[in-house]
């Protein structure tokens, strides 16, 4: 790996982020190409069209697209791979980009201003995009195996998971909790746009503090399924992991299943050009946020000590990322 690879990869990563953000990938739909005439059919202003045309032009230079003489823009194998993995670019560039540029400027490692450098909505969106591409089928199949009625999503982000679950399971209702005000604002918009106001509600709170909210206790007691994707490591850095798990059990006393997914420390010691996507980015940002990332074996020990029975462990098709079904 050379410096040129890293530099060009950084520029390409930003390009990929904007291809998704500005809706260029969306123009392909489920196809591998689209006709450029579609840009005139869309309700874009001149500035938007110029931005999209420039993004397409640079995407051909980076080898993401092919601009053919017949007016079609086609995805290359690299472009298809970028689109499939776009969630990781939304997560890193959109969610943590500002943090990764500025974290060394923070004087106090306990200063909450570091969280102001993180775009929680983009972190949630990127996680959801990656979830849909790699993990969602496994999670839905697991939910279908269970008899679910009232589900709570800890760290719900923009409520994408809850919305999808309620679309699949007609009689299910959901509650989402997230500490990010941006993510909750996005969730409220998504819930409204999907006509789910009567089935899903969201709360802007720290999960551990929500457990003491008297206005939520009655709702918590109706929950039969708890889900949480890529957030346990945050909770485990607030309090002792076993205490956190026991608190969740007490908070949701009638929950029959806990579906908890997280990413663990990589076993690799050196990054190479063959290293898989995401893992090192995950470890990098959390290290400089002073958030410890654990090993899978440690989670198994925490669950056991908290009194959970591990019913199933499933790999989620993202490096070092697993789903635990607990009861």
Provide a role label for each language-model segment.
Residues 261-306, 311-313:
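C-terminal alpha-helical "lid/dimerization" subdomain adjacent to the S-adenosyl-L-methionine
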Residues 58-146:
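Conserved Class I S-adenosyl-L-methionine-dependent methyltransferase catalytic core
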Residues 180:
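Conserved SAM/SAH-binding beta-strand->alpha-helix loop
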Residues 158-170:
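Conserved SAM-binding loop of SAM-dependent methyltransferases across substrates and taxa
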Residues 147-157:
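Conserved class I S-adenosyl-L-methionine
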Residues 234-247:
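A short, conserved alpha-helix within the catalytic core of class I
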Residues 187-188:
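Conserved SAM-binding loop
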Residues 1-98:
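N-terminal accessory segments
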């Amino acid at each position: 790996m050379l410096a040129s690879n890293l530099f060009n990869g950084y520029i390409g990563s930003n390009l990929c982020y904007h291809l998704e953000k500005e809706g260029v990938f969306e123009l392909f739909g489920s196809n591998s190409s689209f006709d450029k005439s579609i840009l005139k059919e869309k309700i874009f202003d001149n500035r938007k069209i110029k931005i999209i045309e420039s993004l397409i032009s640079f995407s051909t230079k980076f080898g993401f697209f092919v601009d053919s003489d017949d007016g079609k823009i086609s995805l290359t194998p690299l472009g298809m791979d970028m689109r499939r993995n776009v969630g990781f670019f939304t997560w890193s560039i959109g969610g943590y980009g500002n943090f990764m540029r500025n974290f060394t400027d923070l004087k106090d490692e306990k200063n909450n201003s570091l969280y102001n450098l993180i775009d929680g909505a983009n972190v949630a969106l990127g996680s959801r995009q990656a979830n849909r591409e790699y993990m969602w089928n496994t999670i839905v199949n697991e939910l279908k195996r269970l008899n679910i009625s009232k589900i709570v999503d800890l760290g719900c982000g923009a409520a994408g998971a809850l919305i999808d679950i309620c679309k699949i399971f007609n009689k299910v209702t959901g509650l989402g909790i997230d500490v990010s005000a941006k993510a909750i604002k996005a969730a409220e918009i998504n819930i409204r746009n999907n006509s789910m106001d009567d089935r899903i509600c969201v709360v802007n709170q720290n999960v551990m503090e929500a457990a003491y909210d008297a206005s939520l206790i009655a709702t918590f007691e109706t929950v039969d399924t708890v889900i949480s994707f890529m957030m346990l490591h945050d909770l485990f850095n607030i309090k002792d992991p076993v205490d956190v798990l026991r608190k969740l059990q007490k908070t949701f006393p009638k929950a029959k299943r806990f579906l908890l997914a997280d990413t663990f420390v990589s076993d690799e010691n050196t990054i190479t050009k063959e290293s898989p996507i995401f893992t090192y980015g995950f470890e990098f940002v959390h290290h400089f946020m002073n958030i410890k990332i654990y090993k899978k074996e440690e989670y198994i020990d925490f669950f056991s000590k908290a009194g959970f029975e591990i019913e199933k462990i499933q790999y989620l098709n993202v490096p070092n990322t697993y789903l635990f079904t607990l009861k």
